[in-house]
């Protein structure tokens, strides 16, 4: 795969050390969703995969996969949640879009849903739509793709945080693939840090 400049920039501040190629069947994904996906998202799945950023945000799988301990979060469920939130907020009177144009790709620990607004026929031009839980606006469009949005969020480049949590504290940024996190849990370690955790694995089958 050709290296994606946005993902390369993101990797400079958030190493892919604990990421993994998700090995996505993109024709199958496109058949299910009825659309292609942005090049930066495709590249992210190939370099990082789905997983957690600092335990504060999760990047979702485009299609379901069985987990080692629990099923990892997927786009379909959170897309439904975002569309339901749109309806609950007043539908078109609150945010005048077709709800079918809302597709989720991530969530935060503050219960925000990170989405694309897919009204442009070119997926690489889809802006990020934040469906916020405790943000100034319930729906806010940001004129960046997924990778640039994450870069700006992780670099603290927003004057006002676009999400409901203090995402960046100036510390180390870490991405952990969902499969690695679940292995750590099974081994009695903290899924995010890998440090011993007496509670990790407590509810393992």
What positions do the PLM features span?
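Compact, glycine/acidic-enriched structural inserts
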Residues: 132-159
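A surface-exposed partner-binding patch
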Residues: 1-110, 162-168, 176-205
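A broad, low-specificity signal marking well-ordered, structured residues that form hydrophobic/aromatic
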Residues: 102-103, 114-115, 128
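Intrinsically disordered, low-complexity regulatory segments enriched in Ser/Thr/Pro
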Residues: 123-134
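Helix-boundary capping/turn motifs
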Residues: 18-19, 121-124
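Short, surface-exposed beta-strand/loop micro-motifs that present aromatic residues
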Residues: 112-120
